[in-house]
Design a protein with these regions (language model features):
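Ser/Thr/Pro/Gly-biased, low-complexity, turn-/loop-rich segments
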Residues: 2, 17-251
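Sec-dependent bacterial lipoprotein signal peptides
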Residues: 1-17
Length: 251
């Protein structure tokens, strides 16, 4: 009987603890030494993006017809973004002053800057064009400290950086099965990433795109805590107590 109790305690201990391999990130990180860093990431413009386009020149009067009215920084709420910027319509175009409809979907920011610069040089020889995405955001759900929607100001964010913004995974987050949900070319794509391995750094999903969704599913321990499946360690603990009582009574 005592052997049964000891075995139950051993199993209880094993099932109650997360293993080191389940918790530590990038466990084969030594393989990253001297590896080439991916080229600078630049997001591709999509329908429903809102672009901030700034046109400047030595002569302010020349660029005035091409610039929208500037809003105060404290008025830059989500409701005012469309007023401050140019909404990319379902056809992938923006309606730009004087120039009319400009096709921007499928282009990078630098490509749009070059396109507008070429067109505007007919009016302004020293024109400078700057394009930014106003509504670049990612959504982080599941087993993280602070789930929510995060606006990315510099339009460049990696999976580890985004999870850092959300306060990192909880202890109950499954680190080897992170879901990235992305809409691309009218289709929804879902991929899985393993944070315990360093090959995440070479994944096409390492850099997040606007409107990406990260979902961190609960680990087995997290599912047990939710009550959807029996808590085996708790059951074993109960059995151990009962067996211990039986031993004491039958002595």
């Amino acid at each position: 009987m005592r052997k049964v109790v000891l075995m139950s305690l051993a199993v209880f201990t094993l099932l109650s603890c997360a293993t080191k391999k389940e918790i530590i990130y990038f466990q084969d990180s030594n393989s990253l030494n001297n590896t080439e860093i991916q080229k600078a990431f630049e997001p591709i413009i999509e329908p429903n993006d809102i672009l901030h386009i700034s046109i400047s020149s030595f002569d302010d009067s020349l660029v005035a017809p091409f610039n929208k009215e500037k809003f105060a920084e404290n008025n830059a709420s989500s409701d005012n973004l469309a007023l401050q910027g140019y909404l990319v319509n379902s056809e992938g175009n923006i309606n730009f002053p004087v120039l009319g409809a400009i096709a921007v979907a499928g282009k990078s920011r630098s490509e749009i800057e070059n396109l507008l610069r070429t067109k505007l040089m007919e009016y302004i020889t020293d024109v400078v064009v700057d394009v930014r995405i106003l509504n670049f955001k990612v959504t982080i759900l599941g087993e993280v400290a602070n789930p929510g929607v995060y606006t990315i100001r510099n339009e460049r964010v990696t999976v580890p950086e985004a999870l850092g913004l959300a306060g990192d995974l909880t202890d109950d987050g499954n680190r080897n099965n992170i879901s990235i949900i992305r809409e691309e070319n009218g289709k929804r794509i879902v991929t899985k990433l393993d944070l315990t391995k360093s090959d995440i750094f070479t994944s096409n999903f390492f850099f997040l795109k606007q409107n990406d969704v990260i979902y961190v599913e609960p680990s087995l321990r997290g599912v047990k805590k939710s009550g959807f499946i029996p808590d085996i360690p708790a059951l074993l603990s109960l059995v151990t107590v009962i067996l211990s009582a039986v031993i004491i009574i039958t002595r």
